[in-house]
């Protein structure tokens, strides 16, 4: 029986005899942020195990609430900051250099095809876009990873999602993953890898693939994963060119990371996305998804464009094209958070920030804040936000608030209209 790409990565990193389905694997990266890691740090210190297995393989960032909004968040940042200094972790990103982790770390070249990565964050699955196995873990596993550079994980079973066809104008990776989650359900991929393949994925940018993999967890997936290809090589080339004599050589090496034709899958889901229309969530689960047309006219109070799902430069370009020459509706607050300083700088240079500001958007520093209702865009009870984030749980962006998830194009169109609407109304700008 053949192996899936995830199983091949596991096999290459196995460091011990498996115990049933549990394998201990060697880690290429342990990523950290200020919300979950301080608990692990303090626990290790209490156990007199304040050590790290390899400072070069640990990356850390203060991103969820930055700058700190109160004494509690300041204390969390202080713990992470002092720990990074204490152990010589050069890959630490503090205020001025920091950005949303799942956009920042790939942008810095820290994720490679075939890598194994853990982090105390459920959207760690984002890194699978590069052909890596990446999983969010709890505090105990994070502690072991920091201390020993290994993690015990179930041998991966996989759901294969084949995306055929070509995206229509005004339809984006966010619409695709919402449609996939609606099909699988919020528990449909629990403890499984979601492998994204097919012509649609092949045609996607790395940013779009990261959007797909980022939301694998919303169907219960441990990890989302794509096959590395020439698009992956192009994205990473500045970081890997010293390791390969040519791009073709890198591509040849990466092409080995594919599933075998006779690999065993728990399920194969084929979707033709050629006729897919823009999607938006309703209710309080990510699998509550409808065509935007069925939610047309739903009033909104706020639009948020950003996050580890849709805060990259490609996303800001899409939104800015819709907004150019338009104004935010008087009843709507528009907020945009570029995901990293590099994204922010590029958006400035391209005139995107000027477009957002001219339209009436507030532009924030790179941060996760609003996505999880911690800062920079928290909702009041009864308010509604059309958001490019990844979760619409009850109270996610503020107690009593409602979140509708959508693409940057749909979010931008909603900001103009004051309600959920299709960006086809601004089609020439959105294409």
Curated annotation (Swiss-Prot):
It catalyses: (2R,3S)-3-isopropylmalate = (2S)-2-isopropylmalate. Pathway: Amino-acid biosynthesis; L-leucine biosynthesis; L-leucine from 3-methyl-2-oxobutanoate: step 2/4. It holds the Pfam family Aconitase. GO terms for biological process: L-leucine biosynthetic process. Its EC number is 4.2.1.33. InterPro entries: Acnase/IPM_dHydase_lsu_aba_1/3, Acoase/IPM_deHydtase_lsu_aba, Aconitase_4Fe-4S_BS, Aconitase_4Fe-4S_dom, HAcnase/IPMdehydase_lsu_prok, Homoacnase/IPMdehydase_lsu, IPM_dehydratase_rel_enz, IPMI_cat. The keyword Oxidoreductase does not apply. GO terms for molecular function: 3-isopropylmalate dehydratase activity; 4 iron, 4 sulfur cluster binding; metal ion binding. [4Fe-4S] cluster binds at residues 308, 368, 371. It is an enzyme of class 4 (lyase). Keywords: 4Fe-4S, Amino-acid biosynthesis, Branched-chain amino acid biosynthesis, Iron, Iron-sulfur, Leucine biosynthesis, Lyase, Metal-binding. Its cofactor is [4Fe-4S] cluster. Binds 1 [4Fe-4S] cluster per subunit. PANTHER family: 3-ISOPROPYLMALATE DEHYDRATASE LARGE SUBUNIT 2, HOMOACONITASE, MITOCHONDRIAL-RELATED. Heterodimer of LeuC and LeuD. Catalyzes the isomerization between 2-isopropylmalate and 3-isopropylmalate, via the formation of 2-isopropylmaleate. Belongs to the aconitase/IPM isomerase family. LeuC type 2 subfamily. This is 3-isopropylmalate dehydratase large subunit.
